[in-house]
């Protein structure tokens, strides 16, 4: 699965460290990621490969940091182009694939928090934690946590699998679901 990156370690604590030349850049545009694929594996651009306008620390895998590059239009060069994130699961699992999936979640969250849901004023990134803060009314918004369950239903050597009809990749999957509002 995407998160199975052992022996590597994912660190999602917020940090304000400066990007280094060999750190990785996660640049999303809609439902695409600026990257390239080599031998079925995802390759992410490095800080030294792009002209970043504003990098936002996302997380680290081991000692390697990943940064979000928002509102940028990177040119397709050196094999890098915008790849449909719905097809990421077709690639070989590894730290770059985990970074792409986790980064997309943060990208979508930051993109959806541009304006305060309480007063409508523009939000700002917190300077003390991973949060968006409204300077007008003080409303603070944190990334959503969506509890989920994935189960294997089996009878001896038989296994119940599902297949999602409207997904770009038509793979079989275990039965899965999310906790909705009001459920426990």
Regions found by a protein language model. Give the residues of each.
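Short N-terminal secondary-structure initiator segments
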Residues: 18-39, 99-119, 182
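Acidic, metal-coordinating catalytic segment for phosphate/diphosphate chemistry
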Residues: 100-101, 105-149
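The catalytic Nudix box helix
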Residues: 173-184
């Amino acid at each position: 699965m995407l998160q199975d990156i052992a022996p590597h370690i994912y660190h999602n604590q917020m940090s304000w460290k400066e990007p280094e030349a060999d750190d990785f850049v996660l640049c999303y545009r809609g439902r695409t990621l600026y990257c390239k694929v080599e031998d079925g594996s995802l390759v992410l651009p490095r800080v030294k490969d792009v002209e970043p306008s504003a990098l936002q620390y996302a997380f680290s895998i081991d000692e390697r940091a990943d940064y979000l590059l928002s509102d940028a239009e990177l040119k397709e060069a050196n094999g890098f182009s915008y790849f449909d994130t719905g097809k990421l699961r077709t690639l070989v699992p590894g730290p770059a694939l985990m970074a792409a999936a986790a980064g997309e979640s943060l990208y979508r969250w930051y993109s959806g928090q541009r304006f305060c849901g309480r007063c409508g004023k523009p939000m700002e990134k917190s300077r003390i934690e991973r949060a968006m803060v409204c300077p007008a009314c003080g409303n603070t918004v944190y990334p959503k946590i969506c509890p989920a369950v994935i189960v294997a239903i089996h009878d001896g050597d038989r296994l119940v699998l599902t297949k999602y009809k409207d997904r770009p990749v038509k793979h079989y999957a275990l039965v899965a679901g999310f906790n909705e509002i009001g459920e426990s």
